[in-house]
Amino acid sequence: MSGASPTRGFVPGDVVPGAQNAPAFTDAADLLLDSTGLQQASGTPGLLLLADGTRYEGKLFGSEGIAQGELVFTTGMCGYQESMTDPSFAGQVLTFTWPLLGNYGILPGISESAGVHPRGIVCRQVMKIPDHRDSVGSVHEFLAVHGVPGIEGIDTRALTRRVREHGTVLCVFGPKERSDEMKEILSGMTPPDAEDLVASVTCEEAVLLNQGAQDDEGEPLPRLAAIDCGIKYNILRELCKRFEVVWCPASLDFDSIISEWHPDALFASNGPGAPAHPGDAASARESLAAAVRAEMPVMGICLGHQLMGLAAGLRTYKLRYGHRGANQPVVDLQTGRVDITSQNHGFAVEDPDKGMLACLLYTSDAADDTPCV
């Protein structure tokens, strides 16, 4: 990630208190507007190495250098800019299963954060000259200004099948001529789940986004403390339509949240890494548990939901390859109805009684019979 700030992309001076003022955020695409003299992708021969010994050859684009992380894939046909700027992908090398990446370029105002969070991008083909009237640059240029490498020309179908069959795997890619260096890096890699990834993406200080927010009848909206475990901009925007939102770092303890901000409810966001990690994720988990003890309403999305499960005494576990993309089938366990959903998570809450969570969630993933959250 690049372009971080104490409030991770929030611009306080651009917000006027009141119900009709949406928060303003620094978009990851803004760096392209300030950049000049960017070079086209060099097409340097590249090499992708997996920890199981599998290797793929391709061509490099984006930032020069070596990328390393946990290899995962996402199945969306579009929305690549939102995926690349989603903090939940921190620590990972992101593969796009759709064969063409970047056909409409990079658009202003649609990023989910101020930076690019995957440590590397893998695709079949990257569009060199995007075709959209609002585009401010190509995917290559976008990754280059954010310091993130990419590799194209990879058989992503074979790569995806490998991950589906055997699970996520550590990987490294970079210039083919540096293969010996990459092998050495790969041999010493540890899973990113061991890192405090939440600490790397959370904001550094609490800020009130929409002070004085009101509903359509002029009544004050309830105040929500949103714990930032890697929250996406669009979640903040949607919350601000319904609440007066305090954007809080994951490390901020519950007593401080209550004494300084006096919220009516607590929310825990999406984010990267293992929910049982002892770092900032544990701090957020403790705040959720304290809120429950105080009989305060709580809610969680993605990692936030997993933290709620841990706070309630349940356990979480890592999915074999995760659920990432816009076409994830989910079945309602009460009615049998199947919906196609957008998901992005690599962990789930364990259902020890094979039915205890059904009354709470009503849903289970139809693709591999695992919980959808």
PLM regions: where:
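Conserved small/polar residues in nucleotide/adenosyl-binding loops
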Residues: 362-367
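RNA-binding accessory domains that recognize and position tRNA/RNA substrates
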Residues: 2-3, 8-255
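Short, intrinsically disordered, charge-balanced linker/junction segments flanking boundaries
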Residues: 353-361
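Glycine-rich, phosphate-binding/catalytic loops in enzymes
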Residues: 242-243, 283-286, 358
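Cysteine-nucleophile active-site neighborhood
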Residues: 260, 265, 269-352
